[in-house]
Design a protein with these regions (language model features):
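Charged helix-capping and loop-helix junction motifs
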Residues: 87-97
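Proline-aspartate-enriched helix->loop->beta-strand connector
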Residues: 1-7
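A cross-family glycoside hydrolase active-site/sugar-binding cleft signature
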Residues: 5, 76, 166
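A residue-level signal for conserved active-site and pocket-lining positions in enzyme catalytic cores
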Residues: 2, 39, 72, 168, ...
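Structured beta-strand-rich core segments of catalytic domains in phosphoester-bond hydrolases
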Residues: 8, 13-89
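Metal-dependent phosphoesterases centered on the DNase I-like endonuclease/exonuclease/phosphatase
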Residues: 22, 96, 101-131, 135-139, ...
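Conserved residues at the C-terminal ends of beta-strands
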Residues: 5, 26, 212
Length: 215
């Protein structure tokens, strides 16, 4: 499994010759912006495209794949921007992302999230309102825009299981994570607010595996 962030593509804009991999993309509504993708040799049970927030799910920042043993979450966290112009949005995102991951860990799916699931023939299930001429693809074989996918319903559950998250978190948690922490203190990615939210994520029971292996 490998994950990409900031793909900046829309559905159908790229054709990759990776026959051994299934591919799952999340797209931003704004063209040429943001986006995430996951490529896997193992077929997932289902794939979520978003956190379950109409406000936060317009930029294609989440692809979450459920496997029998764990959830794999690819994330591209919003940048707080110069002078922390987007810090409020960032704080909302960090809280929603933490709740999303804890929910998956506990077996609770967010509602109203576009989801890829295969039917008995292995083809992606389409939303009832999807256009009649929408092409059907095997799971992971096509670029499925979220507009043609069904959405999860509030209260849906899955099996509780570990969550593995990776991607661009847009934060340097501690001074050891930056070459020159002093001049960057308070800047986007190294503000007290963002560092604090990452601490809260770890306090919720998750582990920074890179730092655990390289203290």
């Amino acid at each position: 499994v490998f994950a990409l962030q900031e793909t900046k593509l829309q559905a159908g804009q790229a054709t990759l010759d990776l026959p051994q991999y299934l591919e799952f993309w999340s797209y931003a509504e704004r063209k040429g912006y943001s986006g995430t993708a996951v490529f896997t040799k193992r077929a997932p049970l289902q794939v979520l495209h978003g956190l379950g927030s109409e406000y936060l799910d317009t930029e294609g920042r989440i692809v979450a794949l459920e496997f029998p043993e764990f959830w794999f979450v690819d994330v591209y966290t919003p940048n707080a921007q110069n002078e922390l112009a987007r810090i409020g949005h960032r704080m909302e995102w960090d809280d929603a992302f933490r709740d999303f991951c804890k929910g998956l860990e506990e077996g609770v799916l967010p509602g109203d999230v576009p989801v890829e699931r295969a039917d008995a023939d292995g083809l992606v299930v389409l939303a009832p309102e999807a256009p009649k001429d929408t092409p059907r693809h095997p799971l992971g074989a096509g670029h499925m825009p979220k507009e043609v996918l069904p959405c999860t319903e509030a209260g849906e559950t899955s099996s509780p299981k570990p969550v593995v998250m990776c991607g661009d978190f847009n934060v340097a948690h501690n001074e050891i994570d930056l070459k020159n922490p002093g001049p960057n203190r308070g800047n986007a990615g190294f503000s007290d607010e963002e560092r604090g939210k990452f601490s809260t994520l770890l306090a919720a029971g998750f582990t920074d595996t890179f730092r655990a292996l390289h203290p």
